[in-house]
């Protein structure tokens, strides 16, 4: 009789465990995003980087894209241009970035761009990961007039982020 009770109890516990797992699985939501999750980027921004001024601008979401740029100046001359296109993907926006030296000389091949895939978004913040999984980027509007881009690298099996660009809104 005791053995039969143990078997029945074990079956009941197993069934309860399976129901809990299935319920949690059914309630799990895949994180997807939209271009509207990036609307906080919109505007004209300025900052300082590597001893010189930087300037950035992003459009509002329209026509299934957001366009942006960063212009870096060193010694009163252009040092680097970055052009961004955020476009919809299966799981959320995909960021494509091209880099240019002065004279619009591309650093990437003609048909190649750095591609960053959407991971998640919160209010005024979005996280992307580079295709080769070597870098993560956080876009974050910390206040109405401050926008920060952070770069993350894997260190000791965890992502460590540092501010890369800190911008102030241009009125």
Spell out what each predicted region is.
Residues 2-14:
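Bacterial N-terminal signal peptides that target proteins for export
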Residues 30-44, 88:
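N-terminal helix-cap/turn-to-beta initiation motif at the start of protein domains
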Residues 26-28:
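Boundary at the C-terminal end of the N-terminal hydrophobic targeting segment
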Residues 54-56, 82, 135-137, 161-165:
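Short beta-strand segments
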Residues 128-129, 137-140:
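Exposed beta-sheet edge/beta-hairpin loop segments within beta-rich domains
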């Amino acid at each position: 009789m005791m053995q039969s009770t143990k078997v029945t109890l074990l079956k009941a516990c197993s069934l309860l465990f399976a129901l809990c797992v299935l319920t949690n699985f059914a309630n799990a939501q895949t994180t997807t995003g939209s271009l509207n999750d990036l609307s906080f980027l919109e505007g004209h921004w300025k900052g300082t980087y590597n001893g010189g001024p930087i300037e950035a601008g992003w459009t509002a979401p329209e026509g299934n894209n957001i366009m942006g740029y960063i212009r870096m100046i060193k010694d009163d001359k252009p040092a680097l241009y970055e052009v961004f296109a955020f476009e919809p993907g299966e799981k959320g926006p995909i960021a494509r970035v091209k880099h240019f030296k002065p004279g619009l000389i591309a650093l990437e091949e003609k048909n190649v761009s750095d591609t960053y895939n959407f991971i998640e978004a919160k209010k005024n913040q979005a996280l992307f990961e580079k295709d080769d999984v070597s870098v993560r980027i956080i876009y974050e509007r910390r206040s109405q007039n401050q926008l920060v881009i952070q770069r993350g690298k894997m260190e000791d099996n965890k992502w460590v982020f540092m501010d890369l660009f800190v911008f102030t809104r241009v009125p």
